[in-house]
Amino acid sequence: MRRHLITILIILFATISSNNVRAQIKNNGAIGSVTIDGKIWNQVAMRPLVPIGKFAVAFDLVIYFDAEGKVLSEGWDFSSASSIKNTLIDKIYYIKFGNPGEATYVRIGALDKLDIGYGILVNGYSNSILYPQDRKIGLTFEKNNQNIKVKAFINDLKENAGLFGGRIHTNAIMGIPIGVSFVTDRNQYLGLKDSDNDGRPNIVDDFPYNNKWWLDTDGDGLSDYDPNEWDIDGDGITDTLDSRIPGYVGDPLVLDDNILKKDEPINVNKDSDGIMAIAVDLGYPLVNNKNYSLTIYSQAAQMVGRAMNPETKKIENLGIGIIPLGVASHFGSLKFKFEYRLIPNGRFEFDYWNRLYEIERISFARNSSNQILLRTKESSLGNYGEQKGFFSGASIDLGGLLLADFSYNDMRGNLWSVKDGQFMETNNQTFLSSLSLKKGFSRLKRASAFYQQRNVPNPFKFEYSESTIIGYNVGISMGQGLVLNYIFRRSFRDYNANGRIDGDNETIDITSIETSFIF
């Protein structure tokens, strides 16, 4: 593995050091530490940005090693053709051609913030929310001309386009701008890590690094299918006397005819679960000039899938969301958006594919045997009944120094209450905010912070849930071109499936402390 690692580094370093592009390259390096899957790793990184005409390539060449010098092999795996492919594309943070809004724009790699149309389906989606412990190589594409605009995206080429979608927008129909969007997640389980590629995600795989085994009922370290496992359920009774038992030479004799085995974990390669949605939007610009614009629009979307009604226990089709009136405006450095929203029959969520989607994609529950079960985000839509309310958002550039962005969604209607065992009328609110420094001053080179919480009765109570994410990034100049960076991101997972977040064990902290430099 080390031989392959060194060879690739030599090739990449030689490429980006060639005379043809050396003068244009922005070479950034970093040393420091980062938290991955709860463990602290040291890192040495080289992140050159190579511009070639309208193209630009940002590499992410990082080696992680622990206190004992052991290299994290996950990003340098050459054991199979698939692993080699993923290892190579992991070394690219992004490749891009052009810029958003130009005639042609393509970006491959990290998708930090993606919107489709006015955002009824895709709003602020990110495939890099768990970076660097989860590296996704996405794709977004735009083709724009005077009469038609096309935009498409894929969340991760490594998972063979699990999530993808797009939008076609035209003003050629009676002069009215019309857009049609489509999004599908063909297998929602693909969002879970599967280290041994056996189809059983780590969270339900008793042997996450051994693709031969995945089930261990009694937790003794031996697979239920291992010939050396004589007592599958650990009840102290040998299951069967046969030739596996040392010294036994007789005919096979069943001693335990009541073996209580765990259920087989899901195999996501065979048991996929998809969801899709389509949307239509109409917009008309009332005013459109450089310093001021005002557009009114309307949107409607239909989600295609099924979820269980927790009251009737029936499986029902997903619902529709309607925005009969929306207003988007900008005045100088201020951008504003307002929408009136309706969910007439429930089983729908606005901004379904949002910044947190790669975390929300799968949640957890437990069966009567206390075994973890996987629940798709789609299945949670059955908890939403009829709702109506409003959405407002604002973004402002404060003197070229700070950029502030806020949005608030206030819906009220029927939501399923586990405590009461019925649908109850209550609030369903979402709050998102971010603040970033646009221009450094003194020793503070960069700073940003964000907070998001979705679909809770009151996001301002700051009670953590799986829909909560917090983060900040601070860069302080140390002189001589050195910048000390502290990057922190916190999200949450209800691993024990009890409906609440229980302390550190269900808190996902991604922390990076590094000293970056330019050379």
Give the residues covered by each predicted segment.
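Gram-negative (and chloroplast) outer-membrane scaffold detector with strong preference
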Residues: I89-G98, E102-Y105
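Bacterial Sec-dependent signal peptides at the C-terminal "C-region" and cleavage site
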Residues: T15-Q24
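Short glycine/proline- and aromatic-enriched beta-strand/turn motifs that initiate or cap beta-hairpins
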Residues: A23-R47
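Positively charged n-region of N-terminal signal peptides that target proteins for export
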Residues: M1-H4
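Outer-membrane beta-barrel "beta-signal"
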Residues: I95, N505-F519
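Surface-exposed loop and membrane-interface regions of Gram-negative outer-membrane beta-barrel proteins
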Residues: V57-Y94, L121
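Bacterial N-terminal signal peptides
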Residues: T7-I16
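Signature for the C-terminal beta-barrel architecture of outer-membrane proteins
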Residues: I25, K39, G69-V71, E102-A103, ...
